[in-house]
Amino acid sequence: MKRFGFLYEKVVSVDNCRLAILNASQNKRKRKMVKDVCDNLEDYAKDLSERLSRMDFLSPYKTRFIKDGLSGKERELQIPAFYPDQCAHHAIMQVLKPIIERSSYHWSCANIPKRGIDHASKGVERATVRDRKHAKYCVKMDISKFYPSIPHGKLKARLREKIKDEKFLQIIFKVIDSHEQGLPIGNYTSPWLAELYLQPLDNLIKQKHRIRHYVRYADDLVLIDSNKRKLRKALHDIFEFVGELGLSIKHDYQLFRIQQYCKDRSGRRGRKIDFVGRCFGVGFTTIRKRRASALMRQSRFIQKLQRENRPIAYRIASGFISRCACFKHTNSYAMRKKYCETVNIKKLKEVISNESKRKCLSQLAHH
């Protein structure tokens, strides 16, 4: 395995720090602190470089609790200060990112840019739509409390396998040790370090067990193959390997036959793969019931507002258009026709356009 060196000089360079501040400030430049830093970019870039050199770039986290989307799960966020914390995280990751991306599995999604829900969905549809012959059985599992459970010692050992620059390692170790246990949800570095930590698991599944189709979305794993015995054996080894990583698989893991139409037209047998908000069967993809219900409610509400000529909020308009876009990637023609096409999308786009213009004018006024 190739180990990388001469990274410390890249991280602490003023050019890298300047770029890190600009990247960290994206979509935040209305905030007073961010505006002050950007207005004095050169001074702060030099200061950040010095802080990284003397390992003085961390301050206490602010804790915040949120409810995560439609799932309703409560999550604890650790929010770092913009300067110097977030800027330092970007400076570190600008150097570390290419190393992690270089060895990442193609169907490892969520933690890497341009590999979101649609990319994960394509990975599953490679099996269920394009390779139906081998899309017979599925293993679906989830790592329990993934971010908070990652052991610092084993993560540091994993970093040492990839990097030989001791000074750079001390900087990244300081970020890891800034949180008592696991990786904090909210740090820019956390998803990238989590991706690096699970890369050996991806290699085990694809190279040792040669599972025909495997997709991972953060800590959710889907394995698809025509051989049930092979999946059982892989499942056993995954449990052992994940245990060695200091993690654990949730008890509700499943091994089941994938839903498909029967040739005698007696209906369907098997179950759909419920993954990334969509349900996959052999030859078709639909939206998860909870997401479909949310779209139906929002569609009726918007239709009522449009009938009464009442104004529609930007948040509602943008959310509905986003939900409708999800239906384009699924076999949900009847629902799209009933709930999306009955809404005046042109009016919603006008609301979004007007809000964008208002934001642009507001930014110009500030300058």
Model-assigned labels for residue ranges:
Residues 1-46, 364-367:
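Non-catalytic, polymerase-adjacent accessory regions of viral genome-replication enzymes
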Residues 3-8, 89, 93-151:
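Active-site-proximal segment of RNA-dependent polymerases
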Residues 36-52, 68-69, 194:
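N-terminal accessory alpha/beta regions
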Residues 51, 125-218, 222-237, 257-258, ...:
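Conserved polymerase palm-domain catalytic core
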Residues 51-73, 87, 164-178:
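Reverse-transcriptase-like RNA-dependent polymerase core
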Residues 74-105, 180-206:
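Conserved pre-motif C helix in the palm subdomain of viral-like polymerases
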Residues 86, 90, 178, 232-239, ...:
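Right-hand nucleic-acid polymerase module
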Residues 110-120, 222-224, 255-264:
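Beta-rich nucleic-acid/ligand-interaction surfaces
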